Design a protein with these regions (language model features):
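Bacterial N-terminal signal peptides
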Residues: 7-18
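Bacterial N-terminal signal peptides that target proteins for export
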Residues: 1-7
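Intrinsically disordered, low-complexity segments enriched in polar/charged small residues
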Residues: 7-9, 23, 188
Length: 627
């Protein structure tokens, strides 16, 4: 029975005026909710209080021994496996039974951030810190120049996931803070890796060709560009950089917002205590010890200092703003009036030929139809945004959201005193000329404490047909699910949250990233391991919509790679569309009841036809067997 008449027509996009580039957008401010189950949760590392709404937590698993106390980072998925990055390496889980994830392999190979992606039998891992070694050793590297250092992409063969084989690496001048994997629909022989490096440029003595000079002084500068690696699938050991696109050309320094009054007071108190306070481009934040320690170790190592004196520590303190500025994309000297010199994340959507670049002070829309030569289609800036961090398209590519990692992820930015437009998401429509138009902001609607690092972070679309549903991490703000079908009116429809890791001081924790994969939602918890959730019916989401979403099956999924969700024909899909018609009051109750009755009848007839067909086949088999 054909059920095409059940499909809802595409949503009409309203005609809007594009805001002036760089201006703070006009928007009716979102209000913070002051009565919510997430407020006042008990603190604790593995025993914190929890609040959950319209979700069911099906599992939580702790990291293996060598990874406890070390930051868990991003996730990738292949078949029944979850690959979890960690600053100490990669953890591989078998989630054939999502309620009981089983540890398959903990591969010790330290490097920050160890963001991961997969394709076929290949695993790619980012390395950026100066302590990462080519041999995966745990002793680190103290020398300022070393040919044992890994800063770039590691490549593993995972034909046997229980025994990954390190087969190659591609070194880059600024390391790989994150990376994105691109499978071109028209190329089955190669894949491409877009590398976003945020570290200072390494010396040419360590990697020939690296230059940290301004492009005006050196056209081959490693600044103001990304790297594209081509990976031949029949010989991944030949992977190499094939281009370094300068997608930031002609961008000027974006507008910035300064600190709030509460922050100014907080910074002065922190300075008096001897803590590290840095100001980058008008944005201020206090660096947690978990950030300071590796930076100081790298600084002293590059200076050849094994036992720092008080004078050495003071020199590091003075150098820190410049170190952070290079990491966060700040200009220097002749380039201080230029725009960003790097991207943080680039979300690739090959099936529509577009990418969303979250590039420090700008959000970019890129054409990736030629994977080795992406180019910029549009750019937006906003003084409410401090650090454009990640991007997500809706399924048809008509909308895009960007996240703002105000403060770098290491500070509490979801307090009652923090503006709701800062550290939030910004939503845009994309017109036929591939220009982006601002619509609204959304931020976690409940206040978090001073002891909880909280700001907008990574997430993914959930394939509910006919709607744009997004699950997102907010560090210690937990995970939140929102409906952004109408980008001017984003609504929270589910959440999970824990209390702070500590109620005495700010300690890093919370959800680094969260993604939907084949019917379940997986969250990489920075300090606590891996959480697994499933959707439950609510006033915002029906059982039929959830069932239809779960008919979508992926062979693999990567954090910065966005697939087109496609729904196979099913009665769940038909019923989901009818539920949406009812919710949107597109038909009266009698009409809705009539359609549902016809679907029920069609399913019964279809089921009976299948049963009758099987019975006839069994009868034929019996008859042939008796002969």
């Amino acid at each position: 029975m054909k059920l095409r008449y059940l499909l809802i027509a595409a949503f009409l996009m309203s005609v809007i005026v594009r805001p002036e580039m760089g201006a703070a957008q006009e928007f009716t401010s979102q209000k913070m909710v002051m009565e919510d189950a997430r407020i006042g949760l008990e603190a604790g590392l593995f025993d914190a209080g929890e609040a959950i709404w319209n979700l069911r937590k099906v599992a939580t698993v702790m990291p293996p021994e060598n990874f406890v106390g070390v930051t868990n980072s991003d996730l990738a998925f292949k078949d029944q496996y979850v690959f979890q990055g960690n600053y100490n390496g990669v953890i591989i889980w078998d989630v054939s039974n999502p309620s009981n994830p089983v540890l398959v392999k903990d591969y010790l190979c330290p490097a920050s951030q160890s963001d991961v992606s997969v394709y076929g039998n290949l695993l790619f891992v980012s390395g950026e810190g100066t302590g990462g070694r080519l041999d995966c050793g745990t002793e680190g590297i103290q020398e300022s120049i070393s040919h044992d250092r890994l800063r770039g992409i590691r490549i593993f063969d995972i034909a046997d996931v229980t025994d990954p084989q390190y087969i190659h690496n591609v070194q880059t001048c600024r390391g790989s803070h994150t990376h994105s994997l691109l499978k071109d629909p028209d190329d089955d022989e190669n894949i491409y890796i877009y590398v976003s490096g945020s570290a200072p440029v390494r010396p040419a003595e360590e990697l020939p060709g690296c230059s940290g000079m301004s492009p005006s002084e050196d056209p081959e500068s490693a600044l103001f560009r990304i790297e594209v690696i081509k990976v031949p699938l029949d010989d991944p050991a030949e992977s190499a950089i094939v281009s370094s696109p300068r997608i930031f050309e002609d961008l000027t320094a974006p507008p910035v917002h300064g600190p709030t009054d509460a922050e100014r007071a907080e910074f002065e108190e922190a300075k008096a205590r001897g803590e590290f306070v840095v100001s980058i481009g008008g944005s201020y934040f206090i660096l947690p010890e978990s950030y300071v320690a590796p930076m100081s170790a790298a600084y002293f190592g590059q200076e050849g200092i094994t036992e720092p004196t008080a004078e050495d520590t003071m020199a590091f303190r003075e150098a820190l703003p410049d170190i952070i500025a290079q990491m966060m994309g700040g200009g220097d000297g002749a380039d201080e009036d230029r725009g960003p010199n790097q991207c943080h994340d680039i979300t690739l959507y090959p099936e529509i030929g577009l990418a969303g670049g979250a590039c420090e002070g700008y959000g970019l829309l890129l054409d990736i139809s030629d994977p080795a030569n992406p180019y910029r289609l549009d750019a937006v800036a906003d003084s409410n945004f401090s650090y454009w961090h990640s991007a997500t398209f809706n399924n048809d590519g008509s909308q895009i959201l960007f996240t703002d990692e105000w403060g770098g992820g290491g500070g509490p930015k979801c307090r009652e005193t923090d503006p709701m437009e800062w550290g939030a998401n910004a939503y845009f429509t994309i017109d036929e000329e591939k220009k982006m138009h601002f619509k609204s902001y959304f931020k976690l609607p409940v206040p978090q404490t001073d002891e909880e690092n909280c700001v907008a972070h990574n997430g993914s679309q959930i394939p509910v047909p006919g709607r744009d549903i997004f699950v997102q991490s907010w560090y210690q703000g937990g995970i939140s699910i929102t409906d952004w079908t109408d980008p001017s009116n984003v609504v929270e429809i589910a959440y999970h949250d824990r209390g702070p890791v500590s109620d005495e001081q700010m300690e890093m924790g919370g959800s680094w990233s969260v993604y939907w994969y084949n019917g379940y939602i997986y969250s990489s918890e920075i300090a606590r391991g891996l959480d697994v959730f499933e959707l439950v019916p609510s006033e915002f989401l029906t059982a039929n919509e959830i069932a239809a979403a779960n008919t979508v099956k992926l062979e693999y999924k990567n954090a910065q790679g966005q697939p087109t969700y496609k729904w196979p024909p099913s009665f769940a899909l038909a019923r989901a569309h009818v539920d949406q018609m009812e919710r949107n009051q597109e038909m009266n109750a009698e009409q809705i009841a009539g359609i549902r009755a016809r679907i029920d009848q069609a399913e019964q007839e279809s089921s009976q036809a299948i049963i009758d067909g099987l019975q006839r086949r069994m009868n034929r088999l019996r008859m042939s067997g008796s002969n």
